[in-house]
């Protein structure tokens, strides 16, 4: 087998020639990834240097080849519920739930009852979701008492969801100890969302009340307990392409199973409230590069896809995405699940439960 050159094509005089040469390079590079090679940081930076809508679509086409070969055509569908909202102790610059910069329009309430959560779990299952994530504000159970009542209540609710529905419960409760990770595992949690949000070097520009390493430690605790890590980040917070690539490389190093990619939808009153929304083609480029770096991972359209991508949402599913968060988000509205199902059908894709790394067989 002849390996693709690790260098991008040199410019030629004709735009058509340049595009054809770029396409050939991307095809060879994507085949290398399909064959089991790993993209280097230098190669990822070369992909990030691709400019122009037509050329970015060529990059997306190559990333889509990787997705088809390594993951198949099933799009993983999940839904979330904000089980406790507002008055958060952390100062994440993107979040309207923070007590440091509260949004008057962001809801504040205590832990929802088991009955309320079960009702929404059933609704999520009816909408086609295969997983249902219980999300809570706060730094996490790690900083609560060992017999924290709310943590115990969430564990009990997880057990009830398993007993009474066909949907798989996930959690996103913040930082956990190894012991708490084991409790979650024993309750039936098989996947836990805990995002890194940004690269190690950019993180302290977004949050100062805890560290990037704190988040990494929790991901490692979850993995050690046998829980799949649903760990990604947010694009469009002012980070560089190097930051985006370093985030993807960190996720590869941690061997996470699922990677939610949120596209910043700036919230009024937050430190990032005036941040310009990401250009949709930059979002597509980032999605494609993540797929090159993470060929077998579940890469998920998460918050902000409607606000940032608009009528171009379908292109993300042609750029490496193989999962979607359906329904509403934590503090913003999503589009109707029926629209998502129609979108998938129009692309010849099937909603369901996507394979984790190492599971897919063509």
From Swiss-Prot:
Cofactor: binding comment: Binds 1 [4Fe-4S] cluster. The cluster is coordinated with 3 cysteines and an exchangeable S-adenosyl-L-methionine. Binds 1 [2Fe-2S] cluster. The cluster is coordinated with 3 cysteines and 1 arginine.
Binding locations of [2Fe-2S] cluster: 133, 170, 230, 300
Single Gene Ontology BP annotation: biotin biosynthetic process
InterPro entries with a match to the protein in the record: Aldolase_TIM, BATS_dom, Biotin_synth/BioAB, Biotin_synthase, Elp3/MiaA/NifB-like_rSAM, rSAM
Pfam families: BATS, Radical_SAM
Involved pathway(s): Cofactor biosynthesis; biotin biosynthesis; biotin from 7,8-diaminononanoate: step 2/2
Family indicated by similarity: Belongs to the radical SAM superfamily. Biotin synthase family.
Protein known as: Biotin synthase
């Amino acid at each position: 087998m002849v390996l693709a050159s690790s260098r991008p094509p040199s410019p030629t005089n004709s735009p058509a020639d340049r595009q054809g040469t770029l396409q050939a390079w991307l095809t060879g590079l994507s085949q290398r990834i399909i064959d089991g090679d790993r993209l280097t940081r230098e190669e990822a930076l070369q992909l990030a240097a691709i400019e122009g809508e037509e050329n970015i679509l060529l990059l997306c086409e190559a990333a889509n080849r990787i997705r088809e070969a390594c993951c198949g055509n099933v799009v993983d569908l999940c839904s979330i519920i904000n089980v406790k909202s507002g008055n958060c102790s952390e100062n994440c610059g993107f979040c309207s739930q923070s007590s440091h910069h509260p949004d008057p329009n962001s809801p504040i309430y205590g832990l929802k009852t088991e009955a309320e959560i079960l009702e929404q779990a059933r609704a999520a299952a009816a909408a086609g979701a295969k997983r249902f994530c219980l999300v809570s504000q706060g730094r996490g159970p790690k900083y609560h008492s060992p017999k924290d009542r709310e943590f115990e209540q969430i564990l009990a609710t997880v057990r009830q969801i398993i007993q009474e529905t066909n949907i798989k419960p996930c959690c996103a409760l913040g930082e956990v100890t190894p012991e708490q990770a084991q409790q979650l595992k024993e309750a039936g949690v098989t996947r836990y969302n805990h995002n890194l949000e940004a690269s190690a070097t950019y993180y302290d520009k977004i949050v100062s009340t805890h560290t990037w390493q704190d988040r990494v430690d929790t991901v490692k605790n979850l993995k050690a307990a046998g829980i799949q890590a649903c760990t990604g980040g947010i694009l469009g917070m002012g980070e560089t392409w190097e930051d985006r690539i370093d985030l993807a490389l960190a996720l590869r190093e941690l061997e996470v199973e699922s990677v939610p990619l949120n596209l910043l939808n700036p919230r009024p009153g937050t430190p990032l409230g005036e941040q310009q929304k990401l250009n949709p083609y930059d979002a597509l480029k980032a999605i494609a590069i993540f797929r090159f770096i993470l060929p077998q991972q579940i890469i998920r359209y998460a918050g902000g896809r409607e606000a940032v991508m608009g009528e171009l949402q379908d292109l993300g599913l042609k750029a490496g995405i193989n999962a979607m968060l359906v329904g509403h988000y934590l503090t913003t509205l999503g589009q109707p699940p029926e629209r998502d199902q129609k979108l998938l059908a129009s692309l010849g894709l099937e909603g369901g439960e996507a394979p984790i790394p190492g599971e897919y067989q063509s």
